[in-house]
UniProtKB/Swiss-Prot annotation:
It comes from the Eukaryota. CDD domains: CYCLIN_CCNB1-like_rpt1. Pfam families: Cyclin_C (PF02984), Cyclin_N (PF00134). GO terms for molecular function: cyclin-dependent protein serine/threonine kinase regulator activity; ubiquitin protein ligase binding. This is G2/mitotic-specific cyclin-B1. It comes from Caenorhabditis elegans. GO terms for cellular component: cyclin-dependent protein kinase holoenzyme complex; cytoplasm; microtubule organizing center; nucleus. Its main location: cytoplasm. It is found in: Cytoplasm. Residues 1-13 have a biased composition (Polar residues). PROSITE patterns: CYCLINS (PS00292). The keyword Cytoplasm applies.
Length: 361
């Protein structure tokens, strides 16, 4: 049975959260204080940059908000054009419907593998982008039918190895990947599968994930000067959306759905089950449809499919890696918010969306 072993070897990787790498000759590693300053000299240098006459509070807050938005998008004036490009670019990578049909590996085998990969992803403290890219690589390889059932786990761990090289700053050593499979696969086998993956995909790994679209939609929905939103409530809603997006990774049916549609559906469902002051659900649907350039029927179809998949994958009791992951306080413990009543509401949303979509035809 696939499982991420608990006794992970001590790696050479250093935790970056509370320690800062000391430069050569500066002595041992030193804890970083709350402001990230290691020396008094650094503190004096930063204080020297502060203006002696600070701006009025309102002006300073407005300037800070603009700077934060600009830092988030790097080129705020082009944000809409970037989003449109991402929507156009994702069409290049759409998988065929029912790409898992016709032999082995089966959708059930894939679901078990993805659940195990989520466990490995959590154990290695990898970024969410790495997980999404891992599953994207896995599905593209499965569509090409170049991997047998016997090599499915090797394909999965090698896909994560490639994805971590693409997304991570501090990536695990290849021996960590060997160890996490309990030495079922050697370094040589992982490197050989890496070559197979890159050659089969022509080194093209740059598909935008649903997480990218979710962040864009979150920025758009939260920019409402007329009616400021409840940021704390929106944090919970955003994490519920992320959870729903990862539940979609478990099911091969969602692999042929555009990532922008998955992100839109996850945000609509999350706003319905966890409303946010300052954001009206109906208005949010209109904003999302306009931003996506899609009809309401297309979004309703995506909501119906994601609601059905999320309900099924969260309710089942065997593959619980994502459910356990979102019990973390770093992810707002949104698994605890997914009560039976909330899940039933999601299920009803899926059924209602199906009815609404059929009436629009």
């Amino acid at each position: 049975m696939l499982r991420a072993t608990n006794n992970r070897r001590t790696s050479n990787n250093v935790e970056k959260d509370s320690l800062q790498m000391a430069k050569h000759g500066n002595g041992p590693l030193k804890p970083v204080n709350a402001q990230g300053l290691q020396t008094k000299r650094e503190a004096r240098e930063i204080l020297a940059l502060k203006p002696s006459n600070p701006a009025p509070v309102e002006t300073a807050q407005k300037s800070q908000r603009i700077n934060l938005q600009d830092a988030e998008t790097k080129c705020l004036a082009m944000a809409d054009d970037i989003y449109k490009y991402l929507v156009h670019h994702e069409k290049k990578y759409l998988l065929e419907e029912c790409f898992m049909e016709g032999g082995e590996p089966t959708p059930k085998m894939r679901r078990i593998l993805v659940d195990w990969l989520v466990q490995v992803h959590v154990r290695f403290h990898l970024t969410p982008e790495t997980l999404h890219l891992t599953v994207f690589i896995l599905d593209r390889m499965l569509q090409k039918k170049v991997t047998s059932k016997a090599d499915l786990q090797l394909l999965g761990i090698s896909a994560m190895f490639v994805a971590s090289k693409f997304e991570e700053v501090y990536l695990p050593d290849i021996h960590d990947y060997e160890f996490i499979t309990e030495n079922t696969y050697s370094k040589k086998q992982i490197l050989a599968m890496e070559q197979t993956i890159l050659n089969s995909l022509n080194f093209d790994l740059s598909c935008p994930s649903s997480l990218v679209f979710l962040r864009c939609l979150s920025r758009i929905l939260s920019e409402n000067d007329a009616s400021p939103i409840d940021n704390q409530a929106f944090c919970y809603t955003y994490n519920i959306s992320k959870c729903l997006g990862e539940l979609a990774l478990l099911d091969s049916v969602m692999a042929s759905t555009p990532r922008s549609h998955i992100a839109s559906a996850s945000m609509i469902i999350a706003l319905e089950v966890h409303p946010v002051d300052g954001i009206e659900a109906e208005n949010a649907v209109s904003v999302i449809c306009k931003q996506l350039g899609a009809s309401k029927k297309v979004i309703e179809d995506a909501v119906a499919l994601l609601a059905e998949v999320s309900y099924k994958n969260f309710k089942q009791g065997k593959l619980v890696a994502i459910k356990n992951k979102y019990q973390s306080s770093k992810l707002a413990q949104v698994s605890n918010l997914m009560t039976d009543d909330v899940l039933e509401k999601i299920n009803r949303m899926g059924q209602n969306a199906k009815v609404d979509a059929s009436e629009m035809e």
